Amino acid sequence: MSQGNMTGYLPGDPRYGLSGEALRNYYRAKPAQWAIYCWDKPGTQATRRALLPNQKRYVEDFGERVIGYGHFVSDDGRDTLGTSFFMQLDDRAAADKFLADEPLNKAGLYQRVEVHRWSNSFQKRQVDYRRKGLQQFLCTGPKTGTPEFFRAHLHAHESYFAAYGDSFIFFRGPIRSADGADNIGTALLLELPDRSAADKFWNEEPFAKNGGYQKDWHITRWVFGD
């Protein structure tokens, strides 16, 4: 394998051999996808339970545009902290409309909402995933460092992810800039035995262990919404 490929994506990845402007154009050309995180206001559990069937029906109506749908929970799994949606929608206006019409948001349940342009590297959806009955964790974080830093660690990063194989549930992928061109963060979903396994995954990941993420990264326990 050439040294150029040893510093990049692995064979079989549609990004294999791409870098610089060619890689940015690859992301620009992909259909827009969105990671939407909604965090509940305190004391709204009863309202959430009452409106949850409406939310499920709302999400189901989007059919194949739903990449994933689930809820943030406490580490012990007892308390629901919010909801996340991973959607393929035409543009930011469509993402904003999706959120504006979402039943729990319309009811004023959320304390904070985050909408991120995102790209699913796996091209799979939640319905395609065979569940293993373990715990799920969403790992997110904004990236820091220079493009040179990420090029230096990219092959190790991709090889590390490949070693985890089917621990990734149905997606992993970068948070993108508004136009989709630039890699500014990450969002990935893992199924692992427990929180300590999720912490180990993150702490040993090549970008993370070399300071590639800002300090406000998060590992949050997650459950399927369907």
Range-by-range predicted roles:
Residues 2-226:
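Conserved, structured core segments of small domains
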